[in-house]
Amino acid sequence: MYWPMSVIGVHIVRLFGMELSRHTLARACLSAVVVSGGLVPFHFRKHLPVWVRVACLALIFASIGICCVWNFRIMRSHVENPPEWDFRVFWMYGKVLARHGNVYLPSEYQEFKELFQSDTQFTEASLNVGATYPPHSMLLFEPLGFSNIHTAYLLWYVLQTAALLAAIELLRRIFLGGSGVWGLGLAALLLFALRGTWVTINFGQTNFLVLLLILLYWRDHELPRAGVWLALGILVKLYVVFLLLYPLLRRQWLVVAWTVVSSLLLAFASLLVLGPTTFFSYFTLHPASHLPSWVYSERINQSLLAVILRSSNRGLGSHGPLAQPLFLALALLLACVTSWLVYRLRRRCEYGLALVLVLTLLLYPGTLVHYTLILLIPLLVIWEYREDFPGGIWGTVGLIAFVYGSIALQQGDSTFAAMLLVWMVLAGLAVFRTQNLQTIQPEGSDLLTAPH
């Protein structure tokens, strides 16, 4: 179980070999310190004097308040002057749909070239491609087209803020239950200390909605209605479909059935809204295949595929993401190991679900740095079972702080390395838990074979 620490050491050495600015290092250190400063007093809160508890809570909520003020300023600035990425793309989808245009035809977006005076990358990846989201996702974007971009952005931020607040409360209930105001403060602090939160707000992205829906699925993952949350998550971000691996391996057929039925209902609703021509254009035009190759290797992309492409100094060329041999081999290896562990785990199956979640971030070819907002769930699983981790509380705090710092660096492949490290730690804990149960439980014990 000590081998993940060697990985951390190697990564630290590699980071010191980079040309890091003082600003970058300060940002990474601040993120790590803030996280540590929240986790440690939370763990020892029952043993602290009253005045220390009050002081710690005051610092936590003061930090949250400062973050809220800064993010409010970002939102206000973007509502007044919407930046190029990403909300502008969502709003264009809505405008095309509002006039009953085909959102998957690049010709529908030519009017926006003069309106926005876009740069080359925006033109190549958006205006010359058309919508890359599947038809049922357009149910989320169509209402944006009935307002001007400023009003639409304001309403969009209201929706995302509501999702963020709901996600904070769910994080408290699921992973920090019984801790009251401490849990609420820690959940909010961990979210705001994660760089993905700031990037999500800056881009106007949908990660808060995805986080909320995944948390709802996590809460209900043993109930059939969990399939509804998965279907809605797939509507917001297509990569959520990877999470179906978990109910399939656990043979939760009702969850799978509810996911399929809910997805079909959403698809039928989008068919009625978009019309058959636009709906089937997604499948005949294959808009994602027209994306420029640099989308899969740009620095903001921290997927396994992007790391391989950058390391080899080769683009996709004429091949698609699924035609890269090294990517296929490594993806298959990670998927097989994850599947085996999920299948073997019977107790503390949260490790298995967390493994599938991290695997999704690693393998999805379009994983961007702000998708790491979802990584908070696996980290809280590790925190919840910190007695399993080498070093206990201190080892767990060190790991989480290091992951936060690596993500905040945003240098090279540091975000990918952080995600891979979390996967390795979870895999190690799952193996340890499986072997420990086999040693402790007598052969044929029901505890070992009964799903938890």
Predicted features, each with a name:
Residues 68-69, 381-452:
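Aromatic-enriched
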Residues 6-226, 250-376, 384, 437-440, ...:
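Primarily membrane-embedded glycan-assembly and transfer machineries that use lipid-linked glycans
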Residues 148, 234-244, 378:
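Hydrophobic transmembrane alpha-helices
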Residues 227-230, 239-250, 260:
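Transmembrane-embedded, aromatic-rich helix segments that form part
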